[in-house]
């Protein structure tokens, strides 16, 4: 196949460098994946258009027989009072903050540097208890933060392979990371997160920093826009 790859940022890899920085190398080293895929793109003579967002007009100008959409999902902030407060951070804002440091230091060195300095409060409440939230909890606990994870469902760790999750949950318990399931987050304040527990009790989870690490939602906008214009859209 003759392949053209659009990437709106200035480098390949998407959020993999961020994932590599958060995960570290102890359990799952993501860095070789980034290196391997980037190398293969070069070896296979794939036309890479960095710094270009894949718009409908640009795609159709290529006159493609098929389009594979791999733009990733959307990380949205919930409709929650106080979510725009200064003590709140989400995946998108965190990605912007670490973009330059990742370019300068790389994932491994930045992972080590965050153990020396991390501009996040001592007490952290994480909204979202699936793969993003639990990996964030591990990262922060290893850096001395007191972590509480708030999850609306009763299930934690969706997206994490079972063999890892079976080891992760005991580790979190041993490190005093609080996992609160079946809760409703009512409001974010300067003092933390006001929640309603599954037994209908209203309480404040005290936190200096609130991190919204909810799972991403599908982004089907480009898929819908291309329907009928290209023979195959995947």
Where are these regions (language model features)?
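Rossmann-like dinucleotide-binding cores of NAD(P)H-dependent redox enzymes
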Residues: 2-44, 131-183
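Rossmann-like dinucleotide/flavin-binding elements
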Residues: 1-12, 49-61, 70-84, 92-160, ...
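Secondary-structure boundary/capping signal
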Residues: 24, 66-67, 230-231
């Amino acid at each position: 196949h003759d392949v053209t790859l659009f990437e709106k940022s200035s480098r390949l890899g998407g959020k993999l460098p961020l994932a590599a920085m958060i995960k570290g190398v102890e359990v799952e080293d993501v860095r070789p994946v980034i290196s391997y895929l980037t190398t293969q793109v070069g070896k296979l003579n794939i036309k890479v258009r960095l710094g270009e967002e894949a718009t409908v007009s640009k795609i159709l100008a290529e006159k493609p027989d098929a389009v594979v959409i791999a733009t990733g999902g959307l990380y949205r902030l919930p409709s929650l009072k106080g979510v725009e407060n200064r003590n709140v951070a989400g995946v998108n804002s965190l990605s912007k903050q670490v973009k330059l440091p990742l370019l300068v230091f790389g994932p491994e060195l930045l992972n080590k540097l965050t153990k020396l300095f991390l501009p996040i409060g001592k007490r952290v409440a994480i909204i979202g208890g699936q793969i993003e939230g639990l990996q964030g909890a591990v990262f922060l606990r290893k850096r001395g933060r007191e972590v509480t994870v708030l999850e609306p469902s009763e299930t934690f760790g969706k997206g994490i392979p079972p063999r890892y999750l079976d080891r992760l949950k005991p580790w979190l318990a041993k490190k005093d990371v609080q996992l609160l399931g079946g809760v409703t987050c009512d409001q974010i304040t300067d003092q933390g997160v006001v929640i309603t527990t599954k037994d209908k009790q209203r309480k404040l989870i005290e936190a200096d920093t609130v991190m919204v690490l909810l799972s991403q939602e599908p982004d089907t906008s480009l898929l819908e826009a291309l329907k009928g214009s290209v023979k195959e859209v995947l």
